[in-house]
Amino acid sequence: MVKFDSGSESEMTNGDEVHINTKHEVKSRMANGNGVHNVPDHDQFQDRAEMEVLILPDLFSSLMSVPARENPHYASVKADADEWISSVINADAKWASRNKRVDFTYLASIWAPDCSAFALRTSADWNSWAFLFDDQFDEGHLSNDLDGAINEIARTREIMEGTAPRYTADSEHPIRYVFQTLCDRVKQSPEGFYAGKPSSDRFYRRWMWAHELYWEGLVAQVRTNVEGRSFTRGPEEYLAMRRGSLGAYPALVNNEWAYGIDLPEDVADHPLVFEIMVIMSDQILLVNDILSYEKDLRLGVDHNMVRLLKAKGLSTQQAINEVGVMINNCYRRYYRALSELPCFGEEADRALLGYLEVEKNHALGSLLWSYKTGRYFKSKEDGARVRKTRELLIPKKMAAL
């Protein structure tokens, strides 16, 4: 996911291709991996002589230089969220333990440090859904099945539109069940069921719209896989596809809900407001492509900007440097768009400022989460080392790919 994003934005598998259409198959799939580094032979490359040392750009500059805040409900919500998703997919103890390390609640906690426990739980559960759902298209059975991908999205759309059958925790489609509970919750106030004013029809339409953008990106990704065009695209075409398939758009709007932000239509529909969403999605995916580079090499994931630029003739270090330039350009684009935004009036501008805070927190949370959980590294300690030294160590035999 995102999309969030795994060079694959989904970090819930180790690359084994297993269908996940039924509860039993989800359990089989989930037993194979998780959201953290899980390669038994990784430690054999401790000798730096066997490693290519890559220098990363400063990923904590500009908008990312601010300190992060953690939601005070984090600990209690994490325990409940971890237990619930493990129960729904009927996971074994090994997967449940690994899932705790993935810590989707920490990610949600940085995204929305001031939201209610109900909203934080919903955001954490949305993360679990998004990564499970995305795996099917990323490295799973739908990655090269265009008709199957379109069909699964159609069934999920029916849930969002309220025309699908009611699923249960014992359903043969646990991923759909999770999404249905999310739709139920997002229609309510972020304070809880019947605890406040329900979401407006206007907001729910925006929430559906953001998910449609995500699904369009997934279909484009699968089509690219089927056509074998992963490395023949230019950077702009790649960004256009990945900013959708990353899953950042619906995650961002989900965080708007967590804060009770309901943008007026003239604000939500303004091209510069959408441009800021595009810019931050680009920033998130480009950062992700650097940090996920080794994992993507291991799993054979092609949708990665570093790999794309290497296919164009750049060395690995040159490609990473170029992605760093693209990230810095995101900040320039952001400030340019911000300077050109009109004033909409007191109430609308207050909502807009909340939206801008959500955008910044989303990018910062995604960055911190990657280091803290060992998402792409062999441990939290290794993630801390990479952050401190900005050195990414890649086995030379792998770096040649």
UniProtKB/Swiss-Prot annotation:
UniProt keyword Nucleotide-binding present: no
EC number per UniProt: 4.2.3.165
Residues that bind Mg(2+) 2: E139
This protein's UniProt keywords: Lyase, Magnesium, Metal-binding
Reactions the enzyme catalyzes: (2E,6E)-farnesyl diphosphate = (1R,4R,5S)-(-)-guaia-6,10(14)-diene + diphosphate
Pathway: Secondary metabolite biosynthesis; terpenoid biosynthesis
InterPro entries in alphabetical order: Isoprenoid_synthase_dom_sf, Terpene_cyclase-like_2
Pfam family, one: Terpene_syn_C_2
PANTHER family listed in its UniProt record: BETA-PINACENE SYNTHASE-RELATED, TERPENE SYNTHASE
Chain's role: Catalyzes the conversion of (2E,6E)-farnesyl diphosphate (FPP) to yield the bicyclic sesquiterpene guaia-6,10(14)-diene via a 1,10-cyclization, which requires the abstraction of the pyrophosphate from FPP to yield the (E,E)-germacradienyl cation. The only accepted substrate is farnesyl diphosphate (FPP).
Assigned protein family: Belongs to the terpene synthase family.
Domain-related comment: The Asp-Asp-Xaa-Xaa-Asp (DDXXD) motif is important for the catalytic activity, presumably through binding to Mg(2+).
Name of the protein in question: (1R,4R,5S)-(-)-guaia-6,10(14)-diene synthase
